[in-house]
C-alpha cells in the first residue's frame, strides 16, 4: 500500500490558534503530514470556522452544526456530541477519493504510522480480508467495570474507505434516546459507572451496534446487556471484524488523554491489543512467538479475572471509591497498590 492510497480525515472543532487547553490543531496536522507525506488530508468541521490557507489541508469540508444533545451522563454537564461527531465524520469520508481512509480527531496526531505494518500483517493472516482497525483505549471490556458491549473506541479508525463509510452510516441519536434514563431506572445490578448514564447507549455503542447488527451479530437491548448471546457475538465481532491496537502501536498521540496509559483502572477496563490477540484462538496461527503470547495472555487473563472478582465483591465501597462527589484519594491509592499485585 502506498501512502498516496490513504486519506486522513480530521474531524471535529478546529481553531487556528493554540487554545487554553493547549490544543494545537495546526501542529497536529503538520506533524501527521510528516508521518504520511503522500497521503491527502481532509478537515471536516463546522460552517463559520476560521481555517487558514496554510494550515496544511488538501480539502476542507464545512457542515452545518447539528447541535448538542443532553449530557451523556447524569452527573455531567458536558454536551453529548454524538450527532456532531457523526455528521462531521460522515461529511469528511464523503470527500475521500482514495481506497483507504483514516478517521481521527482534530485534537490528536500521529507520531508514526506503525498501524500500516500491523494492518498488513493481519491482512496476510486473513488471506486478504479487510478489517476495521481501531484503538484499544476506551474499547471497553464488557466483563470488567463498565459492562458496555460493542463500545468500540472512536478515536482512530483505519480501513477501506467504504468500510469506514459503512461504520459511520449510523442513524443519528434522537433526543429521546439521549434522555433514556431520565425517565426510567437503570437495569437491576447496574454498576456505579453504568448508573451514571443518561443516554440509552454510550455514543460508541450507538455507532457500533448499528454496524454490527446489520451484519447479523446479536446486539444489546440495553446499555449493559451482557446476556450470553450478546457476549458471545461481541467476542466474535471483535475477533473477526476488528483489529485493536494500543495507541503506541498505531502511532496515535492524544495529549488530552495522556493519563489513560498510566491508569491501572483503564488498563483493566479496556480491551487492549493483547486481549484482542487472545480472541484469535489458542493456536494464534500466523503470530510470531505464539508460545510467549500464550503465556502473556494467561497472565493477563488471571489479573483481569481477579480484578473483576474484587470489583464485584467490593460493591459496598464503590460509592466511597468512585463517587466524584466524595474525596477518596487515600482509599484509591491503597486500592491501586493492592491492584498492582493481582
Language-model-detected regions and their locations in the chain:
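Short aromatic/hydrophobic "clamp" motif used to bind/position activated sugar donors
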Residues: 101
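Membrane-proximal basic amphipathic "stem/tether" segments
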Residues: 263-342
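Active-site-proximal specificity loops/subdomain of glycosyltransferases
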Residues: 44-95
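Short, well-formed alpha-helical segments that are part of the catalytic scaffolds
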Residues: 17-35
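Active-site acidic Asp-centered loop
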Residues: 104-105
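Short loop->beta transition adjacent to catalytic acidic/histidine clusters or analogous donor-positioning motifs
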Residues: 4-6, 33-43, 58-59
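A conserved hydrophobic helix/loop-capping motif in glycosyltransferases and polysaccharide synthases
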Residues: 6-19
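Catalytic core and acceptor-binding pocket of nucleotide-sugar-dependent glycosyltransferases
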Residues: 110-117, 122-282
Amino acid at each position: 500500500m502506498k501512502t498516496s492510497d490513504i486519506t486522513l480525515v480530521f474531524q471535529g472543532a478546529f481553531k487556528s490558534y493554540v487554545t487554553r487547553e493547549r490544543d494545537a490543531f495546526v501542529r497536529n496536522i503538520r506533524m501527521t503530514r510528516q508521518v504520511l507525506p503522500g497521503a491527502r488530508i481532509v478537515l471536516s468541521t463546522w460552517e463559520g470556522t476560521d481555517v487558514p490557507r496554510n494550515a496544511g489541508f488538501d480539502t476542507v469540508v464545512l457542515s452545518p452544526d447539528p447541535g448538542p444533545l443532553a449530557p451523556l451522563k447524569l452527573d455531567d454537564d458536558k454536551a453529548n456530541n454524538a450527532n456532531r461527531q457523526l455528521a462531521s465524520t460522515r461529511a469528511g469520508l464523503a470527500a475521500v477519493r482514495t481506497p483507504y481512509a483514516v478517521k481521527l480527531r482534530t485534537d490528536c496526531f500521529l507520531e508514526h504510522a506503525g498501524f500500516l505494518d500491523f494492518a498488513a500483517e493481519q491482512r496476510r493472516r486473513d488471506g486478504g480480508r479487510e478489517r476495521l482497525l481501531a484503538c484499544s483505549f476506551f474499547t471497553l471490556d464488557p466483563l470488567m467495570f463498565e459492562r458496555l458491549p460493542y463500545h468500540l473506541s472512536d478515536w482512530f479508525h483505519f480501513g477501506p474507505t467504504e468500510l469506514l463509510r459503512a461504520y459511520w452510516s449510523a442513524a443519528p441519536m434522537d433526543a429521546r434516546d439521549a434522555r433514556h434514563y431520565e425517565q426510567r431506572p437503570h437495569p437491576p445490578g447496574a454498576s456505579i459507572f453504568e448508573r451514571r448514564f443518561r443516554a440509552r447507549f454510550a455514543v460508541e455503542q450507538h455507532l457500533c451496534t448499528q454496524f454490527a447488527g446489520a451484519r447479523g451479530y446479536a446486539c444489546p437491548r440495553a446499555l449493559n446487556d451482557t446476556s450470553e448471546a450478546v457476549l458471545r457475538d461481541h467476542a466474535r465481532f471483535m475477533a473477526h471484524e476488528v483489529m485493536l491496537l494500543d495507541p503506541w502501536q498505531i502511532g496515535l498521540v492524544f495529549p488530552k488523554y495522556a493519563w489513560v496509559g498510566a491508569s491501572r483502572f483503564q488498563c483493566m477496563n479496556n480491551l487492549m491489543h493483547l486481549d484482542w490477540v487472545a480472541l484469535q484462538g489458542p493456536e494464534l496461527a500466523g503470530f510470531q512467538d505464539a508460545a510467549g503470547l500464550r503465556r502473556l495472555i494467561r497472565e493477563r487473563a488471571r489479573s483481569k479475572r481477579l480484578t473483576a472478582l474484587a470489583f464485584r465483591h467490593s460493591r459496598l465501597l464503590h460509592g466511597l471509591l468512585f463517587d466524584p462527589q466524595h474525596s477518596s484519594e487515600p482509599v484509591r491509592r491503597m486500592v491501586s497498590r493492592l491492584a498492582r499485585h493481582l
